[in-house]
Amino acid sequence: MKKYLPYLNILGAAACWGCIGLFNRFLMRAGMGAANIVVIRNFGGLVLLTLIFALRERSVFHVKAKHLPIFFGTGVVSMVFFTLCYFKCQELCSLAVSAILLYTAPAMVVLMSAAVFRERITRKKLLALALALLGCSFVTGVWSGDASVTAVGVLFGLGAGFLYALYSIFAPFGLRHYTPFTVVYWTFVFGGLGSLFLLDAGEMRTVFADGRMILVALGLIVISTVLPYLLYTNGLARVESGKASILASLEPVVASFVGILAFGEPVSLMVFLGLGCILTCVYVLR
């Protein structure tokens, strides 16, 4: 069982990320814009982690200045810049196209990991990658006809996939010197502070006048932000970057089931086909 724990960490992270839509939808219905949700996730995650580690693990606060560029990469490049590209893609293309462009990330991680870390590109890994991409295409509805695109939108989507993939490249460099907790904390230092330029304080005050939205925001921060980053980074310390990124493709499947169970979204055969592909992918990589 211990052998599979890192894989379970990554799958758990994907499941937590898949719940983002649950919290986002409640906040957006209350009038919260996407930019402020990014601030809540990233800066809220920083505040929570600072409080936790101040009480339990103060060693995470100490890193060498020469390693700060690594955390600029994981925090600003792979959190803030990625989010901006993804939101821009959603403005210019359909949501289905945006999602499938984002999930080119595992392919990019596999290629970059081969170049940077000399990870082998095996037949098993290529099969799992193909299954993951096929599964994501089923789940996101790209075959349903909702496929409006623009050239600029595609570039932003591919950019989002690339920036998203870079977390799995930058983080292992940090893990060579620090614990997963330290890597996650300093990722949020850069990502949280780097998100503040997106803040719309007036909008946030209006939404949080309803105390229930504060609880929703806390759920977003704990369940779909801090916890998955801790789980994924801990798994990444023991699993190849390429495999980890492919396994994280479980996220859109979970997101689809959250929509079905929480919001009564229609059950689609495509979702179950996607789930089958992703589960087969996990079995192949076991």
Regions found by a protein language model. Give the residues of each.
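Helix-helix packing/entry segments at the starts of transmembrane helices
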Residues: 40, 79, 83, 98-104, ...
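Membrane-interface helix termini and inter-helical loops of multi-pass transporters
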Residues: 22-34, 60-61, 91, 140-152, ...
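Transmembrane alpha-helices of multi-pass small-molecule transport proteins
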Residues: 29-81, 108-109, 162-170, 184-203, ...
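Loop-to-transmembrane alpha-helix entry segments
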Residues: 65-66, 102, 115-138, 147-154, ...
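C-terminal-most transmembrane helix of multi-pass membrane proteins
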Residues: 8, 42, 140-142, 213-215, ...
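Specific transmembrane alpha-helical segments of multi-pass solute transporters/efflux pumps
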Residues: 21, 50-96, 102, 138, ...
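Glycine-/small-residue-enriched transmembrane alpha-helix faces in small-molecule transporters
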Residues: 1-40, 146-173
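Hydrophobic/small/kink-forming positions within alpha-helical transmembrane segments
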Residues: 18, 22, 76-80, 84, ...
